[in-house]
Amino acid sequence: MKRIITVLFAALFCLCAQTYAQNRADELMKQAQESLAKKEYIKARYLFLQAYNSFASQEKYTQAVECGVNASALYHRENYYKEAFELLRNAEQLIGNGEQKLKKNL
């Protein structure tokens, strides 16, 4: 009985953590867009990058690529070309890995 309760608590914790992570990524993306509208480019870039990493870890490829492209554009805007292209290469690799994992084109 004690083992069953422990397993149920662990499952509930994992479910709550996943929901929190999903909401967190969406919130980061929203904050990044708001910062971009306010022309706070460095803050927006940082938030888009955090959202990209969060979506990538959740395997939400569409949102991850969108955030990655936005962060890359902000890197490029401030003449950080190496970082911009590195982020785009990582996004392309993420898509390739996702295609292999899902066995379909994204």
Model region roles, listed by residue range:
Residues 49-54, 89-97:
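Amphipathic alpha-helical segments of tetratricopeptide repeats
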Residues 26-27, 66, 105-106:
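Residue register of alpha-helical TPR repeats
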